[in-house]
Structure formats: C-alpha cells, structure tokens
C-alpha cells in the first residue's frame, strides 16, 4: 500500500453546506444546492417557463397545420380526391385501432388488473394489523394534542383531513408532484397559524411536528420508495458501492477516532445502530432524529479520542466512515423520503438540518470516492476495488499479534481478565484482613472484660437487718386504722 506522507484529509467548507443562492439556510444536493424555499421558487419559475414554451410550441404547430390545410384546399381536384380517399382510409384504420385499445383497457379489465396488483402487493395480515394499530394510536395522539388548542385545533384537524382526502385522489401523480402538494400544505398551514391565529413560533413548530407525524404515518406506504421512481435502483447502487469500499480504513479517511478505547468503540457501535435504525421509522422527523443521534455519538467519540471538542473537519470523515462500516439499508430511499416529505423548516435550519446536509455530502462523497480522495495511487485503488488485495492483507504478510483484529481483541480480553483477576485477589486479601481484624477485636474485648472482672470481683454481702417476712405476724397491726387492719380468716 503506497500512502503519501502528507495526508490532506476530507475538508468541506461550511459555506458549501448553505444554499447557493445565499439566503443563509442549508442547501441540499437533491435540490441542486438550494434550500427548500429557494428550490420551490426556482422550480415554479422553471415550470412556468416550460408551460410558456409548450404553449408557444402548440400555437406554432397549430399555425403550421392551418397553413398546410389552406394550401391543400388550393391543390388540384384530382389530387384533392386522392387525398380525401387517403384520409378516409387513414381515419377508418385509426378508428379500428382506437376501438381495439378501448376494448383492451375496458372497465372490467382495468378492475381485474387492479385487483391482481392489489393481491400481489398486499402485505401479510399481521403487517396490516400492526400498521392499523400504529395509525390508530397516532390518530388518537393527534386528536388529544389538538384538543388543547380549541378552535385553532378544530381548524387544523379539518384542513389535515381535507389534505389526506386530496392526496388519496392524487396517487397517480408523480412523486415530485405529491411532494409539492405536501410542501405547499406545510407552508400554508404554518403561515395561516402565524398570520391569522397569531400562534407563537415555538408552538407552531410543535403543531407542525404533530401534523407531519399524523399525515406521514398514513401516507408512508404510498410515498416511500414508490415503484414509479428509481429510488430502489439507487439503493442497490449505493449498497454495491459501499460493499466494494469495505477495505477503506479509518487512516485513509483521516478519521480522528481510536476504537481501541472502549468508550470510543461503544460510541461507534451506537452511531452505526442509529443510522441503521433510521430505516425502521415511518415519520421523516423520526428518521432525522436517528441521524442526529448518530452524529452526536460521532462527536462524543471524537471528543474522547482527542480530549477536546470535535470540529466540522473531524466530523464529516468520521460520518463517511460510519456509513461505510454500517452500510444502512435503503439509504437513498430514506434520504429522498426525508427531502420530499419532511417539514422544510426542519431541513433549512437547526442541528437536524446541519446533520442531514452532512449525511447527503457523505453519500455524495462515497459515490465519487477515488484514489486521490484516499491519497492512494491509482494502481493500488484499482487493485483494492477489484478485490485482488486489500490493505489488511498486506499488513497480514508481516504478521504480528496486533495485525489481526481477532487476535488483537483476544489479547485485549486477556488483559481485561488479568486486571479483573488482580482486583479479585485484592478484594479477597482485604476480606481476609477484615475477618482477622474482627476476630482480634472480639478477642480483645473478651480479654478486657475478663481483666475488669478479675480486678473488680462481684461480692454479695449479707444484709445488716433481717428482711421482714411477708407472712410473719405484725404486732403493730392494731395501730392501723380500721380500714387498713388485716383480717384473719380461720381456714
């Protein structure tokens, strides 16, 4: 392995994470570097321009057709007759084709095909029950949450129900158009609460989170990785790419993390677990929360390793390493789902937006990873990618106990067992010493008591006056008053 002596590392200017229009919000590769707000503006401009161009094209074609028709009317009679017969034949043939197509796509055949598709796609009853239970739970939580807002809550619930009903009839639209509908709904509801309802911004954010949770729990199975997109193809491509890059080491990426430290190793495992867990969530906000937790574990791992706070230049290479090591399932589908249906304000600002933007950059870096990025020669990079060799194989040629990860872990465990054995021996010695001290203390107390008893013996002396017997005769009884004089009964 030929590594250059000077390592550049992976550096991304923080300004590159921001919207390229300069609005100050975070951009997104899926939005061509724009933030959600600027992308919507650019998208609408491009769409209006396309509509205008299509309208002009239609007008031009109509004029050409009218001119061609006018010129055909001025042609000779014979040619006109021949052309009319040709048109009649063409019309009859076209009518037969249309009739055949109509029969093929008749109502009965359409219904049958839909039933077949639904039966083919129908999940198991257990999955349906689980989804229904979760949907009911989220619905109840949403209604209970809106009850605290009284009239505003009623209006929000009404608008949300109307939106879901509208989305039910828009399933035939492209996923981009459905995403546009969701983004418009988020924008309109938030704006209506701020302008008409005078709701404080922090409460608007909480309400929007609950709205997103409610609607996306219901829409998830229809809009996550739909068949009309190439999301699944991208998932397979990035998984194949990550598997091909399994030989990449932390040193090649200049990752400032030492996994030999147990605390750091635990943080790395937790980060990988969080990024994998993202696929199990249904709400975009929950998926973002997994990315945020993963990123915080990365920052903690770097902080423990370096004994100082992590920087942005340390974070991105480590995030790339975590993605390569974890190979999260359906990574592109999850990124696209968050981009399309998450509340845009959450992606534009805050730590969620920052970490998500970095994840998008990490995926883009992995897709474009080359020899120069890893400070390798092109020859070594090609051999590693083809599987002919790997950096670990080359290190194993000069084998030492530290070169093998399994042996290294074994020695680490043996060292840990040795430390535990020493601690146990210390505890046993301390316990024996404590037992001996207790015995010595007991013997000392017994000796002291014996010495005191011998020094001060207990002597019982007889009394100087005899004790009065209880049953003896008392000659002075007659001096007592009558109520107190004892009475003697003959028995």
UniProtKB/Swiss-Prot annotation:
Q: Which SUPFAM superfamilies match?
A: Glucocorticoid receptor-like (DNA-binding domain), VPS9 domain
Where, subcellularly, is it found? Cytoplasm; Early endosome; Recycling endosome
Q: Where is the composition biased (Low complexity)?
A: 69-84
Limits of the VPS9 domain: 232-375
The main place the protein resides is cytoplasm
Disulfide topology: none
Q: How is it modified after translation?
A: Monoubiquitinated.
Is Protein transport included in the keywords of this UniProt record? yes
Q: Record's InterPro entries?
A: DUF5601, VPS9, Vps9-like, VPS9_dom_sf, Znf_A20
Q: What is the protein named?
A: Rab5 GDP/GTP exchange factor
Q: Give the organism the record lists.
A: Homo sapiens (Human)
């Amino acid at each position: 392995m030929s590594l250059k002596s000077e390592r550049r590392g992976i550096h991304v200017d923080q300004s590159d994470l921001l919207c390229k229009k300069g609005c100050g919000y975070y951009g997104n590769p899926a939005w061509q570097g724009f933030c959600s707000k600027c992308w919507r503006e650019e998208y609408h401009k491009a769409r209006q321009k396309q509509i205008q161009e299509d309208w002009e094209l239609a007008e031009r074609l109509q004029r050409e057709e009218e001119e061609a028709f006018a010129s055909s009317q001025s042609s000779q009679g014979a040619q006109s007759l021949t052309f009319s017969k040709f048109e009649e034949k063409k019309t009859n043939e076209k009518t037969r084709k249309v009739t055949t197509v109509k029969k093929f796509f008749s109502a009965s055949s359409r219904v049958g095909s839909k039933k077949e598709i639904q039966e083919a796609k129908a999940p198991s009853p257990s999955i349906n029950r689980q989804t229904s239970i979760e949907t009911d739970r989220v619905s109840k939580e949403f209604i209970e949450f809106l009850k605290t807002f009284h009239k505003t809550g009623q209006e929000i619930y009404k608008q949300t129900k109307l939106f879901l009903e509208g989305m039910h009839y828009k399933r035939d639209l492209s996923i981009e158009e459905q995403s546009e509908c969701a983004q418009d709904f988020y924008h309109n509801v938030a704006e209506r609460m701020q302008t008409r309802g005078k709701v404080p911004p922090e409460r608007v954010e909480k309400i929007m989170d609950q709205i997103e949770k409610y609607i996306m729990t219901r829409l998830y199975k229809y809009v996550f990785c739909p068949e009309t997109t190439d999301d699944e193809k991208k998932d397979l491509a990035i998984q194949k790419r990550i598997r091909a890059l399994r030989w990449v080491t932390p040193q090649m990426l200049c990752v400032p993390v030492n996994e030999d430290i147990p605390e750091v190793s635990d943080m790395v495992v937790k980060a990988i677990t969080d990024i994998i867990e993202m696929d199990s969530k249904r709400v975009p906000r929950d998926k973002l929360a997994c990315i945020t937790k993963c990123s915080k574990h990365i920052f903690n791992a770097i902080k423990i390793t370096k004994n100082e706070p992590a920087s942005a230049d340390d974070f991105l290479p480590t995030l790339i390493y975590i993605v390569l090591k974890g190979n999260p399932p359906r990574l592109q589908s999850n990124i696209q789902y968050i981009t399309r249906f998450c509340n845009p304000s959450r992606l534009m600002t805050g730590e969620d937006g920052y970490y998500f933007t970095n994840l998008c950059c990490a995926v883009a870096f992995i897709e474009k990873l080359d020899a120069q990025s890893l400070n390798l020669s092109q020859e070594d990079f090609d051999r590693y990618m083809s599987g002919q060799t790997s950096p670990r194989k080359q290190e194993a040629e000069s084998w030492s106990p530290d070169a093998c990860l399994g042996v290294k872990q074994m020695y680490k465990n043996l060292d840990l067992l040795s430390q535990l054995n020493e601690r146990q021996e210390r505890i046993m010695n301390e316990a024996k010493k404590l037992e001996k001290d207790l015995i010595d203390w007991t013997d000392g107390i017994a000796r002291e008591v014996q010495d005191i008893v011998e020094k001060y013996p207990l002597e019982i002396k007889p009394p100087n006056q005899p004790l009065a017997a209880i049953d003896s005769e008392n000659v002075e009884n007659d001096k007592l008053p009558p109520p107190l004089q004892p009475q003697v009964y003959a028995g």
